[in-house]
């Protein structure tokens, strides 16, 4: 009687059960799944910051597995895909959470290519193995963008994007509580399979923008009454061709049927069903970009310098209605890493537990809707903002960590940046010279005080800096502004 050939999905499920059970029970024997021509790569970076390279052969794979120090390794399988590939092989894609040595659980993706072993029917070995942690690929921190002043064109603002922050900020933290299991594979909870996972694509290395909306105080508004209110820098999302990628798979809700229980393999594994994204506010999306001709707009409540012909009254009224009430920066909070399916009412109810929310707005990124949203929360007092900053990290829905920061003006950010450069310049100036550290004042002034110390170089008195880097060739960003 001829044995029926098993389906690729059945082979993949059985392999996943055996592999992760052995990873939990006896990881020192994990190399037996591999052959002489196998390749193995485990996510991470080396000492120089480069991704780990693959190792080849059963012996090298054995040493690599031992170097990873697997101990009490517990795995939660969220989804398994298996398809037939060349030469009667099977490619298996696994997504789940992994906890090693009692550490917090971390999301991972692992791909196996199973090849037939010799002439033995239905026997496979791992020809290729690729493992990556998601938090090493997708970062939840967002790079900060210094918003241009109101006298500059928005196109110039988009050309001066800073470098993104390191994405490996929380490499050892997880969003889930570790649940010990006996065989290393645990059936996930019902609600955990419906969690939204908004993660940006790492392959394109798209620079995220975290706009810090600049708001002037009342004195500055009186001096610049014709200056337009700063518009939210939200560009209309350009919908690219929807190509299939694993980043889009992980960003969708995964069905509970695509899990592996502790007793074996689930009866059926469904591919994730893509769900439509929640549309952002039409008011934000329909907002036109600023141009230089739109700047001279009047604001009610302040004396204008003089009317100018050619202004659109409707556009002026819409802008004034949106930005009549101005709140201090200490009452406002920047909130990043918002899920796509969130609405303003849900977010407002969440922050009402900290204080009275008087205004809230959610903005979307302009990169095809694939990046997390961000927004601003305004309280009627500065005390809730300080409580939230002290209580970080802020977990939303119990699983999504929100990136909360105090709102700062552009002038404050420039003072911090310039102050750092001048401090280093003062340290270098104080370290040189035969008299040792001389403090803030020059050597000539110390000589006048106590009659000792070397004379100033060249017979010229040293100039005292203002601490702001305002002198020629002083300050980190002086050359750039010219």
Swiss-Prot record:
Provide the effect of residue 399 to D.
Answer: Found in a patient with a neurodevelopmental disorder; uncertain significance; no effect on function in stress granule formation shown by rescue assays in transfected G3BP2-deficient cells
UniProt organism field: Homo sapiens
One GO cellular component from the entry? cytosol
From the UniProt entry, list the residue stretches annotated as the region RG-rich region.
404-476
Q: What InterPro entries does the record tag this protein with?
A: G3BP2_RRM, NTF2-like_dom_sf, NTF2_dom, Nuclear_transport_factor_2_euk, Nucleotide-bd_a/b_plait_sf, Ras_GTPase_bind_prot, RBD_domain_sf, RRM_dom
Question: GO terms for molecular function, please?
Answer: molecular condensate scaffold activity; mRNA binding; RNA binding; signaling receptor complex adaptor activity
Q: Where is the composition biased (Polar residues)?
A: 247-264
Q: What is this protein called?
A: Ras GTPase-activating protein-binding protein 2
- Any known activators or inhibitors? Under physiological conditions, G3BP2 adopts a compact state that is stabilized by intramolecular interactions between the RG-rich and the acidic regions that inhibit phase separation. Upon stress, polysomes disassemble and mRNAs are released in an unfolded protein-free state.
**Compartments where located:** Cytoplasm; Cytoplasm, Stress granule
Domain remark from Swiss-Prot or TrEMBL:
Can mediate both protein-protein and protein-RNA interactions via the NTF2 domain and RNA-binding domain RRM; protein-protein and protein-RNA interactions are essential for undergoing liquid-liquid phase separation (LLPS).
- Keyword Aminoacyl-tRNA synthetase set for record: no
- The UniProt entry lists the main location of this chain as cytoplasm
Keywords, comma-separated and alphabetical: Cytoplasm, Host-virus interaction, Immunity, Innate immunity, Isopeptide bond, Methylation, mRNA transport, Phosphoprotein, RNA-binding, Transport, Ubl conjugation
Q: Where Omega-N-methylarginine occurs, residue numbers?
A: 457, 468
Residue ranges, compositional bias (Acidic residues): 140-158
Q: Which modifications occur after translation, per UniProt?
A: (Microbial infection) Cleaved by foot-and-mouth disease virus leader protease; this cleavage suppresses the formation of cytoplasmic stress granules.
Q: Which residues carry this modification: N6-succinyllysine?
A: 392
